[in-house]
Amino acid sequence: MPHTITTTDELAAYCARAATQPYVTVDTEFLRERTYFAQLCLVQVAMPGTDDTDAVLIDPLAEGLSLEPLYELFRNVNVVKVFHAARQDLEIFFVEGGLVPTPLFDTQVAAMVCGFGDQVGYETLVRRIAKANLDKSSRFTDWSRRPLSDAQKVYALADVTYLREIYEYLSAELARTDRTHWLEEELAQLTNADAYVVDPENAWKRLKLRSNSGRVVAIAQQLAAFRETYAQEKNVPRNRVLKDDALLELAGTKPKTVADLGKSRLLLRDARKGAIAEGLVAAVARGMSVPNSEIPKVQAGRDRSNLNPALADLLRVLLKAKAENAGVATKLIASSSDLDDIASGFTDGVWASGWRSEVFGADALRLLNGEVALAAKGQKVKIVEV
């Protein structure tokens, strides 16, 4: 049965061994349904090797256990930290330990570069690369409950044991095709610590504002900042404090008193009284007092009034053909929104530089300028010089 580490000394000994290896594979189990911050419940780590002691479970809920030895390993620049779909795991370690593990390898991103499709799942990679099938019977486990059953432990550990073979295959494939630098460009976004810092003052930018009124924007900014701060301090999901539609309603109705909140059709019961209600009214007042010159500007989307639908369709055909030829997921090269931008006459974007330009961007611009055309030959689409 998988071994579970429950003491700091044992964790330090394991991490000292792992520090001599070229890489470790890492995964986490956590809960987030009822909290703002994810509750870390289990960490799975494996190093190269077949011995039972090479892959372990770490119980962060064990009394007295410090994860500092693990964080020291995460800071070791000589050991690659391998994850699959790393973003949520990285966010947890940033919040819990104040760091982003580096150097990083994300097998989901690497698989997209290697032609396995868009956002391919771990189970698919296990089946296609490791030629194994995962037992998913423990998928919906409450990982905060103890003790964990043997079946739950086996399920959790499989998330890092097969990951070793997947990493070795994908890293070799990247080296063979000279695409390692493609992956590094993508991973730079994941390892940027700023991506995991939530600034309450910028929380309003996630809202889908339906009004262009500057005053509505100012109030929405203050309401969103209050909601984010309250949710963080109380560690509750932001939508349990104030739902987006209720926030936008208040930004429009501009309640001046707690009693005015009773007129809302959308406010949750707990938001109509007490600290939340008082905070909402105060936020509205702050929004009303923001000078016009300091009201944040809503970033307007690009004007696509000149969008040529036929050209957008041609670009989609070109993208799919070029992606298939290069063995890269289309989503990694350009999004549907990018294609609409190109078809509207915009010639800047991530697709227009670096390896994306080599694979697709340069030919997209040539198509836009009438220098090439698309033709079908049998089952293949090819580019024809005009």
Curated annotation (Swiss-Prot):
Cofactor: a divalent metal cation
Keyword Transport: no
UniProt-listed GO biological process terms: tRNA 3'-end processing
Keywords in alphabetical order: Cytoplasm, Exonuclease, Hydrolase, Nuclease, tRNA processing
Domain called 3'-5' exonuclease: residue spans: 3-174
Gene Ontology CC: one annotated term: cytoplasm
Subcellular location: Cytoplasm
PROSITE patterns assigned to the protein according to its UniProt record, in alphabetical order: HRDC
Function: Exonuclease involved in the 3' processing of various precursor tRNAs. Initiates hydrolysis at the 3'-terminus of an RNA molecule and releases 5'-mononucleotides.
Membership in a protein family: Belongs to the RNase D family.
PANTHER family hit by this protein: RIBONUCLEASE D (PTHR47649:SF1)
Name of the protein in question: Ribonuclease D
Originating gene: rnd
